[in-house]
Structures are given as C-alpha cells and as structure tokens.
C-alpha cells in the first residue's frame, strides 16, 4: 500500500529468499493474458484453437474455441482427481517430465505432445470443468498468436508491471516449452 508491504509472512520451508512454485495461480495469469489478447484483437474468442495452432486440428481441442479454453468449458476426457493414480493429470505431468517416467514409458514426451492425445468426452461449451490441459492449450494458442513464448508474454504483459523484486521462473519440458497450466515460480 502506497509503495509499502502491508503484510508478509512465510510458513514451513518458505523463506523470503526461496523460490515458491505458484502452481495453478499460473492459470489466472494466462486467463488474464488471453482476455487481454481478445480485447486488443490479437485473439478471436469465437475462433477454434486450431486457427492458431494447426497441430490441434485433429485433436479433441480442434474445434474448441478460444473462449471455451478460457472458460474451461471443453468436453475433454481429463481427470484431475489426484487420489486416482490413473487420472490423466499424472500422464500430463509425466509428459512434461515433472514426475519420473516409469520403466518402458513410451507416451508423450512434451506438454504439447500430451495435448494431442487427450480424447473428447461430451461437447464443448456445455459445462465448466477445471482441467489444466485447457490452460496448457491456451498457452500454446497465445504463444502462436503473438509469436512470443509463454514466458515472454507473461513478462511483457504482467510480470514487468507488478513491481516484482525478482524474475519469475517456469517449469519447462524436455524441449523448453513453459508449462502454462501450472509452472510459474
């Protein structure tokens, strides 16, 4: 407030000098960036994601609109039930190499490769369902529409304006793709 910190406290292993992964807070930043890009005409909210990322054309995301990604109203088979070892979230994070891959793993090796394996379940636009893959796909759309990486978009549109004392960091996969679904630190 008025240039001064009003309240600051650290719990557990967190310290003023330490890094803290923001996980799903990342989604809010990219929802905001997506809305900014719709407002300035860079993105068409009613266009299919595949307009910006042709690789998504034959995937479950192919006919999902930018608005449906922003609103998380895609009809996708993707569970984030963390108590279920077979939930799709685990394969998603394995693809990005956030978790060790089991011996013989032959699945997707990047976040974007994983998006191409997601199956459709129901219709897009019918109901909200919290699914990290929506924001990961949105990040890909944003990167393509702006010709800038996910990280550069965050830096330019939000981080540089926050007055943050330090740079932000991103979790990346094996090819250097930032995890828009939850990789901000």
Residue spans of the language-model regions?
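Active-site helix/loop module of the DD-peptidase/beta-lactamase fold
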Residues: 21, 39-82, 117, 133, ...
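A short mid-domain helix/strand-loop element embedded in enzyme catalytic domains
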Residues: 108-109, 129-136
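Acidic/histidine-rich, surface-exposed loop or edge segments in extracytoplasmic proteins
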Residues: 10-14, 51, 136-137
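Short, charged, amphipathic alpha-helices and their helix-cap/turn boundaries
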Residues: 4-9, 48-51, 85-123, 149-167
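Active-site SXXK
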Residues: 3, 21-46, 69, 138-142
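Short, conserved catalytic-motif segment at the N-terminal edge
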Residues: 1-22
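Solvent-exposed loop and edge beta-strand segments that line ligand/cofactor-binding
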Residues: 122-130, 178-185
């Amino acid at each position: 407030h008025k240039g001064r910190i009003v309240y600051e406290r650290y719990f557990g292993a967190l310290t003023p000098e330490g890094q803290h992964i923001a996980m799903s807070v990342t989604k809010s930043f990219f929802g905001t960036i997506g809305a900014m890009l719709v407002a300035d005409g860079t993105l068409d909210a009613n266009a299919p994601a595949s307009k910006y990322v042709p690789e998504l054309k034959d995937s479950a995301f192919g006919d999902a609109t930018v608005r449906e990604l922003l609103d998380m109203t895609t009809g996708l088979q993707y569970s984030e039930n963390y108590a279920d070892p077979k939930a799709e979230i685990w394969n998603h994070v394995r693809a990005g190499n956030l978790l060790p891959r089991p011996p013989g793993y032959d699945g997707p090796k990047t976040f974007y490769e994983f998006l191409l394996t997601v199956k459709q379940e129901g219709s897009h636009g019918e109901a909200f369902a919290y699914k990290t893959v929506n924001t990961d796909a949105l990040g890909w759309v944003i990167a393509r529409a702006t010709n800038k990486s996910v990280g550069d978009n965050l830096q330019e549109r939000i981080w540089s304006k926050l007055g943050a004392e330090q740079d932000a960091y991103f979790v990346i996969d094996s090819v250097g793709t930032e995890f828009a679904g939850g990789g901000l630190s």
